[in-house]
Amino acid sequence: MSSRGNGVAVSDDLKMGGGAKRSLDRIREAYLMTGGARRIDECSGNVDHRRAQLEGYGGARHGLKCNGGYRARYPGSMETPPLSAWGYGIATISTDTNTVLDSWFPKPQLGEPPANFDPHLIPADLAALEGSDDSRGVIRTGVTTVIGLTSPPQSTSDAYLRLHLLSHCLVTPNSVNLEGIFGLLPIVAFTTRGPVSPEFYDTHRMALMESGAMITSLDRFPPLLNYVTPSRVRIADVTRVRLGAHLAPGTTVMHEGFVNFNPGTLGTSMVEGRISQGVVIGDGTDIGGGASIMGTLSGGGKEVISVGQRCLLGANSGIGISLGDDCVVEAGLYVTAGTKVRVLSGGDGTEVKAGTLSGKANLLFRRNSVSGAVEVLSRDGQGVELNSALHA
């Protein structure tokens, strides 16, 4: 751990106006005088006596105590998720906008901090990363963040810690409260040299490009691999998997695959299509090239979709309903909740809305090549079997 005298705790929210700017000026001054930037404490609101308190800061509102409300369960399990988490990290703060651009938590932890926890100290290896980078217009400072997972996130670092928990597979999709997360994540120019504020990059574009700082994405959510390297996972295109994606060991995401924040795979899976926010994919499932799974972030959709084990979404297919285990959707067929489906197995060809079949197992959805009608029939035995050579 780093020494107490080498740094103190200050607030994450350095974007709150005049008080925040004065505080940032003090941080810069302290950095020049001591050779180390001051640290951030989001744990208890106890700011070191050497710091003036930031305007708008209140550690108590950072969700340290869980007061009920949000209590999701792990998919397929009666186990309730942990109520709190904490971590030591490094925050990148823009010097031109006084905004926390990102926070990196290399070893996030579930539960309450240990009894000997001191929020004013961070590990020495993280303290060594503190400093300023004038070429990017940022300073890097340590953060100590403790959060309640049932409460909405309250700050940028709080939001980043939740995304790290998901991508480290410490929590499962939909088990952590992410309400309001978009408002806490600024739009950032994520570059090959780290995060930069878009305004700073636009003003200093030539110098940044000459230094090798090329923009890889301009987004609120960064690429997952900038922060986490999942075990036994293949990701062909770094930019197509966001931080906050939950990728179980054995998952392969090919070039045209996309995984948003807070969906995920629960086992070995092939992803060549799009997995929207909140969608959960079972073990042994293949999301074919260009396939699409409807989400709830836009377009009015309300149902969170899940896909069972050993399912196949054919190339360029799509679903707006959940699938049970061992289901197949024919290539090119999009099945929404309102799609009229003709039931062929064990029936007289009655038409029903596909939504009535949501979550049922052992089904094959196909389009009749003569009439164009969408049909569903029962399948026997297991579903698809993945090629083990394609998975770590």
Regions found by a protein language model. Give the residues of each.
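A conserved acidic, glycine/proline-rich C-terminal tail/linker
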Residues: 339-355
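Alpha-helix boundary/capping motif
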Residues: 13-14
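Terminal amphipathic alpha-helical/low-complexity segments used for targeting or macromolecular assembly
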Residues: 2-3, 10, 19-21, 27-29, ...
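A structural motif detector for beta-strand N-caps
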Residues: 233, 239-241, 245-247, 251-253, ...
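Short Gly/Pro-enriched loop/turn and capping motifs at secondary-structure junctions
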Residues: 318-320, 334-336, 341, 370-372
